[in-house]
Structures are given as C-alpha cells and as structure tokens.
Regions:
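Phosphate/NTP-binding elements of NTP-utilizing enzymes
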Residues: 1-153
C-alpha cells in the first residue's frame, strides 16, 4: 500500500498525527504493527510493516518516493496540491498510478479539496472516471442517498 501527500513533510506529519494514533487506539492494528520503539520493528515514520504487507507514505514532491515499488492499493490525498512536474519525471499522479500497473485488481483512491475549476486535478480525474457515488441508507427510512456536505451534522 502507498499513501501520498503533497510533500514528504506532510506525509511525516500525517503519519505522526493520524496514522500512529490510529494504530495505538486500534487493538487489531496494534497487534499487527510493532511499536516504533522496538529495534528493527519495521515501524518508521514513513513505513508501517505488518504481516502480509507494508504501508509506505511519501510526498508527491519526491520522484524517488514515487518509483520502484509496486503497490496494489494507492491513496492519493490532497491531489490539487501536487506539483505538476516532479524532478523532471512527470506529474505525481501519473507517477504514483504507474506503481499499480502490475495489479489487475488495483485500487486507487484520490481525495482533495477542489481548487480552481478547470485546473483542478481532482476535478479532472473525476471527469475522466465513471463518476460513481457511494450511497448510504437513511437511518430513519432506509432510502439510499448520496451524502452531501450540507447533509452532514
């Protein structure tokens, strides 16, 4: 698995502020991933090893971090903040997606706050997709609905 943020610094911050607390508060994950304090634990700021896999975290500003490792599951966060060209090797989204090409059943998840319409990477990717939406049942009547921000409380 690979998770990509706009910069390596953001990847480190998200690892410390989101991923580590998630592991520490989840008994199932805590059982799978050795504490960072353990010698040779496989648990570093930018990599979390577990039986059967590894979560590698990197920044979209690092061509080195976006190459050489095949990944079946790819999470791209805040893609509108990605550089248009990474070290002369191309755009970060394409470089990251190239890591998944060897897997027939790959999963790629792009997330971002859209920026300028017409220039937004997440808007472009959504327009190029099949534009599926996730529907959830209403807790009152069970009607399946697409969640919108204005519906959240």
């Amino acid at each position: 698995m690979m998770a990509v943020w706009p910069t390596v610094g953001m990847a480190k911050r998200n690892s410390k502020q989101r991923i580590d607390p998630l592991i520490e508060e989840s008994p199932a994950l805590l059982e799978l991933i050795a504490p960072a304090r353990s010698r040779d634990s496989g648990n570093t700021i930018l990599a979390k090893e577990f039986r059967g896999g590894v979560l590698v975290m990197t920044g979209a500003n690092s061509a080195v971090g976006l190459r050489s490792m095949p990944v079946r599951y790819l999470f791209l966060d805040e893609v509108d903040g990605y550089p248009l060209d990474v070290d002369g090797e191309g755009d970060a989204i394409s470089l990251a997606e190239a890591r998944t090409r060897t897997f027939a059943r790959r999963k790629i998840f792009l997330v971002s706050t859209p920026t300028i319409s017409g220039a937004s990477a997440v808007e472009r990717e959504y327009e190029a997709s099949d534009q599926r939406r996730y529907f959830v049942p209403c807790p009152h009547c069970s009607h399946r609905q697409w969640l919108r921000f204005e519906q959240l409380r």
